[in-house]
Amino acid sequence: RRQRQMCIRDSPITNEGAGGEVYHTIYYVAESPHDKDIIYAGADDGLVHITMDGGKNWSNITPDLEEGMINSIDVSPHDPATVYIAFNRYKFDDFKPYVLKSSNYGKTWKVYNNGIEKNSFVRVVREDNVKKGLLYAGTERGIYLSTDGGENWDKWQRNLPIVPITDLKVHQNDLVVATQGRGFWIYDDLTPIHELSEVSKDKNVHMFEV
């Protein structure tokens, strides 16, 4: 049977169908929970696009960073203009964490990584469904928590093993964690975390409700 041939960097190779030879590929798509016509698309080459009309027209809103991968996109459940991106460059031997945030539909971006270990590249970011500005970040070496919209991050490992976090989902006041090689974990009842997000860090003692 005759095999299909394709050319990469001017050298013919056999397309074995595994997909490793494919690049500039859409890697993540996120629909806004506020408007079904607003959709974000991120690619494995770092490009980000947005459509405001259900896919008829797209605009390039790529952050001004070196080439990397858009690993996940999360639209804020509280503000339709706010979106978070987990961006990484580990394939370029850059393991720094990149949590990107835009508050204007991707017109401008800012990196938020204060407190995240320098070699813990980020795979996923989610905002809490109840508390605005309460963020969870899944990294290559565990989970981080931010109570101030990403300005500062704290390690939130608890009894979770040191393992890559591949996805996060807030579901019915629980945080569901998908890991690479260690199964699924669930942080049951986020109520104390919601309460903690309202506590000033200047207070030495806080009594939680029981």
Where in this protein do the model-derived segments appear?
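Repeat-solenoid scaffold signature
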Residues: R1, D128-E198
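Short, small-residue-biased leader/transition segments that mark boundaries at the very start
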Residues: Q3-I8
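Conserved blade-ending motifs and adjacent loop-strand segments that build the rim/top face
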Residues: D10-G19, Y23, D64-N71, N113-R126, ...
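Conserved beta-strand position repeated across blades of beta-propeller domains
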Residues: A30-S32, D74-S76, R126-E127, K169
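Short coil/turn segments that connect the beta-strands within blades of beta-propeller domains
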Residues: K36-D37, P80-A81, K132-G133, N173
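Recurrent small/Gly-Pro-centered beta-turn motifs in extracellular repeat architectures
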Residues: A43, A86-N88, T139, T179-Q180
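A short loop-to-beta-strand structural motif that recurs across blades of beta-propeller domains
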Residues: L47-I50, N57, P97-K101, T108, ...
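Short, solvent-exposed loop/turn segments at conserved positions within beta-propeller repeat blades
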Residues: K91-K96, A137
